C-alpha cells in the first residue's frame, strides 16, 4: 500500500539551485544537507540540491556530495535551458565575467529563470563589499552608499541593480549579501 504522507512530503521537498558551486558553494551545501530540518515548529524534508556546472569533469565529485549536477555555462545562455523551472530557491555565487561594467552572466541567468514563469520564489546573491569602494578607513555599513570604482565592483553593482529590478517584477524574495574578502585553503591574499 502506498504511504501518501511520504509521497506528499516528497513533493514538498525544497529544491535549491546553486550557481557557482566552488569552495563557498560546497560549504553552503554541507550546511544545507547536515543542518537541522526543523524551523518554527515545522519539520521539512532535506532539500534537493542542484548545481550548475560548466565542467563535466566535476559531475562525479558533485554527485558524491549529494548534489545533482546540471550542465550549463553562464557565458553561453543557450546551455542554460535546463534550469528555467528547476528550483524555487537559487543561491548565486558565481563571479561576473572578467571585463566590462555589466555582469552579463547574471543577466543571462535571470533571462532564463524568467522563462520559468514564477517558479523562483527566493534568490540569494553573494556580492562584495568592494561595491563601497575605498573609504580610507571610514566606517561602512549596509546603509552606506556604494561608490564602486573598479570594473569588478561596477559589474557587481550592475548585477545587484538588475537583480533588484527582476525580483520586483517577478515577485521574488531577493537577498543580497555583500561579503568581504573570502579566505580559505588556497585562497589567501598573499603571494
Language-model regions, residue ranges each:
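Glycine-rich Rossmann-fold phosphate-binding loop(s) that bind the pyrophosphate
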Residues: 21-22
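N-terminal Rossmann-fold NAD(P) dinucleotide-binding loop
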Residues: 25-26
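N-terminal Rossmann-fold cofactor-binding loop
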Residues: 50-57, 73-74
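Conserved Rossmann-fold cofactor-binding substructure of NAD(P)-dependent oxidoreductases
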Residues: 63-87
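NAD(P)-cofactor binding segment of oxidoreductase domains
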Residues: 83-125, 161
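Conserved Rossmann-fold NAD(P)-dependent oxidoreductase catalytic core, especially the SDR/UDP-sugar
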Residues: 110-151
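Conserved beta-loop-beta element that borders a ligand/cofactor-binding pocket
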Residues: 161-185
Amino acid at each position: 500500500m502506498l504511504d501518501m504522507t511520504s509521497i506528499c512530503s516528497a513533493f514538498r521537498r525544497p529544491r535549491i539551485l546553486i550557481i557557482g558551486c566552488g569552495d563557498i558553494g560546497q560549504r553552503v551545501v554541507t550546511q544545507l544537507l547536515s543542518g537541522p530540518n526543523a524551523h518554527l515548529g515545522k519539520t521539512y524534508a532535506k532539500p534537493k540540491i542542484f548545481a550548475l556546472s560548466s565542467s563535466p569533469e566535476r559531475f562525479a565529485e558533485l554527485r558524491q556530495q549529494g548534489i545533482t549536477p546540471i550542465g550549463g555555462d553562464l557565458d553561453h545562455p543557450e546551455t542554460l535551458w535546463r534550469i528555467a523551472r528547476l528550483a524555487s530557491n537559487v543561491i548565486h555565487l558565481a563571479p561576473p565575467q572578467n571585463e566590462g561594467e555589466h555582469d552579463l552572466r547574471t543577466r543571462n541567468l535571470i533571462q532564463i529563470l524568467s522563462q520559468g514563469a514564477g517558479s523562483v520564489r527566493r534568490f540569494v546573491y553573494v556580492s562584495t563589499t568592494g561595491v563601497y569602494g575605498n573609504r580610507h578607513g571610514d566606517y561602512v555599513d549596509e546603509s552606506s552608499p556604494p561608490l564602486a570604482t573598479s570594473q569588478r565592483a561596477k559589474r557587481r553593482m550592475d548585477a545587484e541593480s538588475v537583480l533588484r529590478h527582476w525580483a520586483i517584477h517577478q515577485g521574488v524574495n531577493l537577498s543580497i549579501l555583500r561579503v568581504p574578502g573570502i579566505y580559505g585553503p588556497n585562497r589567501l591574499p598573499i603571494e
